[in-house]
A protein has these predicted regions:
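Conserved catalytic cysteine-centered active-site region
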Residues: 31-56, 141-172
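Conserved small-residue
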Residues: 29, 65, 83, 123, ...
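Active-site-adjacent elements of ketosynthase-type condensing enzymes
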Residues: 19-45, 87-107, 131-143, 184-217
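Cys-dependent condensing catalytic cores that perform Claisen condensation/acyl-transfer
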Residues: 1-43, 152, 174, 239
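Condensing-enzyme catalytic core mediating Claisen C-C bond formation in acyl metabolism
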Residues: 40-116, 125, 239
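Flexible, low-complexity linker/loop segments at domain and module junctions
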Residues: 116-122, 201-239
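Beta-strand segments within the central parallel beta-sheet cores of soluble alpha/beta enzyme folds
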Residues: 9-17, 78-86, 121-128, 154-161, ...
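Active-site-proximal alpha-helical scaffold in enzymes
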Residues: 1-18, 56-77, 165-187, 232
């Protein structure tokens, strides 16, 4: 994004892929007690739920073509969305755990929104990192409330409730999902939510809240181990 914005490139391919559902991958994350021990698939990946117990590993990938407007128009590309901001911070709190106050994640969201040249109230949807671990979901909820306010109407969901955690591919596929949400004006549901954790005081996208008609801006959060926080601000494309 920055390479293109600052004129060092016209077009770049970005993305990630992951295929780590194997003995070593599972053993490593199990040792960290990050994986859900639930055997029932319907109870295994429950972002923001009171009874969440960890994440489910997933496999997959996504590639996004980023290019400047002139380049896209010259080749008659179908433009799906616009990247308008980016934020990046590091908690420097713990080797794996995020800062429980959500301070670093909040700063990354604020950076992305500021670069987009908008105020937080213009953002209608947050694609949360939402791993279904206790530490991430409670801390990320605090961070969202720091940025948008506790009584904000911004809608939030974690698509890891459907895809599992794609690890190195999570950011790419969740950015693609967020772009599609903007284009289709359809918010992805946070499936599997039975009882919202009181520590996660945010507006979750449930089955009856997926349709929207005025979604112009959204952000996608990627909050990695060790508090490595990256946030994309995206805008619905219009001529």
């Amino acid at each position: 994004y920055r390479q293109i914005k600052e004129g060092r490139a016209q077009v770049m391919l970005t993305g990630g892929s992951e295929a780590s559902v194997n003995e070593i991958g599972i053993a490593g994350f199990a040792t960290l007690t990050a994986l859900s021990p639930e055997k029932d698939p319907l109870k295994a990946s429950l972002p923001f739920d009171r009874n969440r117990s960890g994440f489910v590993m997933g496999e997959g990938g996504a590639t996004l073509v980023l290019e400047n407007l002139e380049h896209a128009q010259k080749r008659n590309a179908t433009i799906l969305g616009e990247v308008v901001g980016y934020g990046s911070t590091c908690d420097a709190f713990h080797i794996t755990s995020p800062d429980p106050t959500g301070e670093g994640a909040a700063r990354a969201m604020k950076q992305a929104i500021d670069e987009a040249g908008i105020t937080p109230d213009k953002v209608g949807y947050v694609n949360a990192h939402g791993t279904a671990t206790h530490a991430n979901d409670s801390g990320e909820s605090l961070a969202i409330n720091k940025v948008f306010g506790e009584n904000s109407s911004v809608m939030v969901s974690s698509t890891k409730s459907m895809t599992g955690h794609l690890l190195g591919a999570a950011g790419a596929i969740e950015a693609a999902i967020t772009v599609r949400a903007l284009k289709m004006q359809q918010l992805p549901e946070n499936v599997g939510l039975n009882e919202l954790d009181e520590e996660c005081n945010i507006n979750i996208v449930t089955k009856d809240k997926t349709t929207t008609s005025n979604l112009e801006y959204a952000i996608s959060n990627s909050l990695g181990f060790g508090g490595h926080n990256a946030v994309l601000a995206l805008r619905k494309w219009s001529e």
